[in-house]
């Protein structure tokens, strides 16, 4: 996953930028200077007003939308027995799940104690607008 906006920001270059930022948010990495990703390291900032939050949501949901379009286009052919269709469907489901994995890990409370709390929006069709639902659903 590559960011089409990569030229707009020095620390926004897709999935690898997400991985580096989240590594710095944990306690397993020391940051000795004040350059790229310093606010991720110092603040662990996930507020809605933070630029990185906007980037995560826009980019991951754009990939989810693309995966949903591929899934919608291939569902009719799924029973054809064509292995390449099955592989593309599997890859699209995996990519979509991986994006949701990132969003849930960043913005979700632990499942076991928060089943009734609102979760992230789940889109399984292209061009849908859904309301948030409790995590238990």
Where are these regions (language model features)?
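Acidic, glycine-rich segments characteristic of secretory precursors and extracytoplasmic regions
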Residues: 1-20
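Generic N-terminal helix/loop capping motif
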Residues: 4-8, 27, 70-77
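Non-catalytic effector/regulatory segments
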Residues: 2-8, 32-39
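Short coil/linker segments at helix-helix boundaries
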Residues: 106-137
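Acidic helix-start/capping segments at beta-turn-to-alpha-helix junctions
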Residues: 18-23, 87-88, 94-95, 123
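Conserved, well-structured interaction surfaces
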Residues: 33-107, 133-136
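Active-site substrate-recognition loop segments, prototypically the cytochrome P450 B′-helix/B-C loop
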Residues: 17-36
């Amino acid at each position: 996953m590559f960011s089409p906006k990569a030229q707009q920001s020095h620390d926004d270059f897709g999935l690898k930028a997400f991985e580096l930022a989240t590594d710095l948010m944990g306690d397993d990495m020391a940051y000795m200077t004040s350059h790229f990703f310093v606010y991720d390291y110092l603040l662990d900032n996930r507020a809605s007003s933070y630029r990185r939050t906007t980037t995560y949501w826009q980019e991951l949901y754009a990939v989810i939308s693309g995966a949903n379009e591929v899934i919608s286009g291939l569902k009719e052919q799924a029973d054809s027995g064509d292995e390449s269709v099955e592989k593309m469907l599997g890859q699209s489901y995996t990519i979509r799940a991986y994006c949701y994995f990132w969003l849930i890990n960043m913005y979700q409370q632990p499942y076991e104690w928060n089943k009734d709390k609102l979760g992230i929006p789940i889109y399984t069709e292209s061009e849908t607008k859904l309301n948030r639902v409790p995590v238990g659903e």
